[in-house]
Swiss-Prot record:
Positions where Phosphothreonine occurs in the chain: T38
UniProt xrefs under Pfam families: Pkinase (PF00069)
Keyword list, A-Z: Acetylation, ATP-binding, Cell cycle, Chromatin regulator, Coiled coil, DNA damage, Kinase, Nucleotide-binding, Nucleus, Phosphoprotein, Serine/threonine-protein kinase, Transferase
Enzyme class per UniProt: transferase
Species this protein is from: Homo sapiens (Human)
Subunit organization: Heterodimer with TLK2.
Active site: D586 (proton acceptor)
Name by which UniProt lists this protein: Serine/threonine-protein kinase tousled-like 1
Compositional bias annotation for Polar residues: 1-19, 87-103, 353-365
One GO MF term attached to the UniProt entry: protein serine/threonine kinase activity
An annotated GO cellular component: nucleoplasm
Length: 766
């Protein structure tokens, strides 16, 4: 009988001790199951013992004999190692099971040849008893132990891998880096499977091992462990630092939050105090303005209600200041009449000249005699007045000089009275405006300093239009003054009309919101109060508009007017350079604000309610259709806006150029070039603008020819002949370096060489 393994073959009949240690395939599986369930103490668990009892009795006896022999050989020499001990050691040291040392197939066919008799069982039990009594010696003398067929070279080392013969090591698994667990081929036969009886093993079974080797030593492991401990300490230290930093940051956040709350509270207190102070100041200003208005009512005049039939009208009554001026004017007129009468009497007493002194005397005697004869002067009871005595020539000239001086003095007084009257008229205009403002403010629902949108504190009313009120307000967020325009819709309007008005206001807001230029009033905000009220917040300008200035001063110098026109044209150029371009369409003195209230300062353009957007859809080569014909201020619109036809007229930015020309003319001459004393209805009915083919300039005041030429270019009747905004911006009259013409410079140089004409005569003065 021969036993064949992966390391070689052993011939000879096996002894009973060999048979007792030769496991069957089923016993090998049971052994593996038992070893897998064996705790580190070496004693199998209850589950493993239950599996052993469930086996065939014959196999159970073989396994018992094998484990008994292994247990007895565990204390012997190093050549015969105990499998159970090795399994227990492997589980503790290298985490290998007993199956990794000798993988046994769990499958073994039951054949009649392998059945043994009762005697073999008895001999096996006898061999087991001998193994127990020998305690580590070789089993019997009839054969070898099954462990003798495997030549262990590693001695009794702790790892089973060290005791595996080199011949049966798998080269594929010797360099494997997988986890230290056994890998057993399921179909490989066990090398310890021996045939019982006289039947040899037909097919040898091969063993497959998975070997893990490492270069780590205890020092390296200790170093790695120490490094790991240091890393953990560093990480823990870093975590502690981060936790402390996090705590510090949280503490700082809490402190900053408390500080923020404190600042918010302080800010709210400041805002509340600012509101209180602003309201107090506004209240005092209202009181002072009303007191001043009451005083001016007596001095300048006031409105009185007069009944005319069934209606009542307001009539203006002048105050004592105007009455005194009227009395002074009457006294001056009376004095002038007296002086004229005395001058006539003085002319009668004018002495005759030396040549004519004798002729009147000779001729007077016959006349006297004739009168006496006819009238009977000698018997006439009436006494005739004596003829005025003739003055000497010196006396006559003396009286004549006195009368001339008195007339000159009266003329001077009359001029002063006229100047004072004009000044009082300007003050009266302010007074009338203030009276209307106070009346409108008293009737307004926003008179009690409300805060709109939780931001804008209303101070006092600036003015009132048809459907809007403009208040001076204070922005509590930005800490600046602003002008709040409150649009109030008529509650009796239809919803369609309200929607159109609101749409128009939103359109103005969208246009104005995108504009950013120093010569255009900025639009800050837009919000609604209710369904019938919405507000727009504009930049606040301290001064008045140009229309009020012209009403006060009638006109201005050419330099001041030119400065205003330059700023207007600069703003128009900006409106035509943005995309899409914009036509203002409502340029007039009322929409030009004087920042300082004077003509020598900055201006700003406002009111884009009628402006037109020249987008690609509506603007063509000839311009865009005028869809709002009839709107605007007629004195400042060009003739093409009044053309009535089947199709609407075409307009372009030349509409604003015409308006610039009219404004410049009005600033220079104090009157409008077309329809000055006409109403808008008269202008529309009489076609005044359509007939304005040429502009006529008054004689006074004197204006330079360059300014007149500039006005003619702006007021060209045909829009094809009129400048556009870009051409107007490049006009030589508006360029600072063109104020001195080349021709005048040449004449000046010629005058220096030919005549002693002063150099200033060749400079164009405005």
């Amino acid at each position: 009988m021969s036993v064949q393994s992966s390391s070689g073959s052993l011939e000879g009949p096996p002894s009973w001790s060999q048979l007792s240690t030769s496991p069957t395939p089923g016993s090998a599986a049971a052994a593996r199951s038992l070893l897998n369930h064996t705790p580190p103490s070496g004693r199998p668990r209850e589950g493993a013992m239950d599996e052993l009892h469930s086996l065939d009795p014959r196999r159970q006896e073989l396994l018992e004999a094998r484990f008994t022999g292994v247990a007895s050989g565990s204390t012997g020499s190093t050549g015969s190692c105990s499998v159970g001990a090795k399994a227990s050691t492997n589980n503790e040291s290298s985490n290998h099971s007993f199956g990794s040392l000798g993988s046994l197939s769990d499958k073994e066919s039951e054949t009649p040849e392998k059945k043994q008799s009762e005697s073999s069982r008895g001999r096996k039990r006898k061999a087991e008893n001998q193994n127990e009594s020998s305690q580590g010696k070789s089993i019997g003398g009839r054969g070898h132990k099954i462990s003798d067929y495997f030549e262990y070279q590693g001695g009794n080392g702790s790892s089973p891998v060290r005791g595996i013969p080199p011949a049966i090591r798998s080269p594929q698994n010797s360099h494997s880096h997988s986890t230290p667990s056994s890998s057993v081929r399921p179909n490989s036969p066990s090398p310890t499977a021996l045939a019982f009886g006289d039947h040899p093993i037909v097919q040898p079974k091969q063993l497959s091992f998975k070997i893990i080797q490492t270069d780590l030593t205890m020092l390296k492991l200790a170093a790695l462990e120490s490094n790991k401990i240091q890393d953990l300490e560093k990480k823990e230290g870093r975590i502690d630092d981060l936790l402390r930093a996090n705590c510090d940051l949280r503490r700082q956040i809490d402190e900053q939050q408390k500080l923020l709350e404190k600042y918010k509270e302080r800010l709210n207190k400041c805002i509340s105090m600012s509101k209180k102070l602003l309201i107090e100041k506004s209240t005092q200003e209202k009181l002072s303005s009303r007191e001043k208005s009451m005083q001016d009512r007596l001095r300048l005049g006031h409105f009185t209600t007069v009944r005319h039939g069934a209606s009542f009208t307001e009539q203006w009554t002048d105050g004592f200041a105007f009455q005194n001026l009227v009395k002074q004017q009457e006294w001056v007129n009376q004095q002038r009449e007296d002086i004229e009468r005395q001058r006539k009497l003085l002319a009668k007493r004018k002495p005759p000249t030396a040549n004519n002194s004798q002729a009147p005397s000779t001729n007077s005697e016959p006349k006297q005699r004739k009168n006496k004869a006819v009238n009977g002067a000698e018997n006439d009871p009436f006494v005739r007045p004596n003829l005025p005595q003739l003055l000497t020539l010196a006396e006559y000239h003396e009286q004549e000089e006195i009368f001339k001086l008195r007339l000159g003095h009266l003329k001077k007084e009359e001029a002063e009275i006229q100047a004072e009257l004009e000044r009082l008229e300007r003050v009266r205009n302010l007074h009338i405006r203030e009276l209307k403002r106070i009346n409108n403010e008293d009737n307004s629902q926003f008179k009690d300093h409300p805060t709109l949108n939780e931001r804008y504190l209303l101070l006092h009313l600036l003015g009132r239009g048809g459907f809007s009120e403009v208040y001076k307000a204070f922005d509590l967020y930005e800490q600046r003054y602003a002008a709040v325009k409150i649009h109030q819709l008529n509650k009796s309007w239809r919803d369609e009309k309200k929607e159109n008005y609101h749409k128009h206001a939103c359109r103005e807001y969208r246009i104005h919101k995108e504009l950013d230029h120093p010569r255009i009033v900025k639009l800050y905000d837009y919000f609604s109060l209710d369904t019938d009220t919405f507000c727009t917040v504009l930049e606040y300008c301290e001064g008045n508009d140009l229309d009020f200035y012209l009403k006060q001063h009638k006109l201005m110098s050419e330099k001041e007017a030119r400065s205003i026109v330059m700023q207007i044209v600069n703003a128009l150029r900006y409106l035509n350079e943005i995309k899409p371009p914009i036509i203002h369409y409502d340029l007039k003195p009322g929409n030009i604000l004087l920042v300082d209230g004077t003509a020598c300062g900055e201006i700003k353009i406002t009111d884009f309610g009628l402006s037109k957007i020249m987008d690609d859809d509506s603007y063509g080569v000839d311009g865009m259709d005028l869809t709002s014909q009839g709107a605007g201020t007629y004195w400042y619109l060009p003739p093409e806006c009044f053309v009535v036809g089947k199709e609407p007229p075409k307009i372009s930015n030349k509409v604003d150029v015409w308006s610039v020309g009219v404004i410049f003319f009005q600033c220079l001459y104090g009157r409008k070039p077309f329809g000055h004393n006409q109403s808008q209805q008269d202008i529309l009915q009489e076609n005044t603008i359509l007939k304005a083919t040429e502009v006529q300039f008054p004689v006074k005041p004197v204006v330079s020819s360059e300014a007149k030429a500039f006005i003619r270019r702006c007021l060209a009747y045909r829009k094809e002949d009129r400048f556009d905004v870009h051409q107007l911006a490049n006009d030589p009259y508006l360029l600072p370096h063109m104020r001195r013409s080349n021709s005048s410079g040449n004449l000046h140089m010629a005058g220096l060489t030919a005549s002693p004409t002063p150099p200033s005569s060749s400079i164009i003065t405005y």
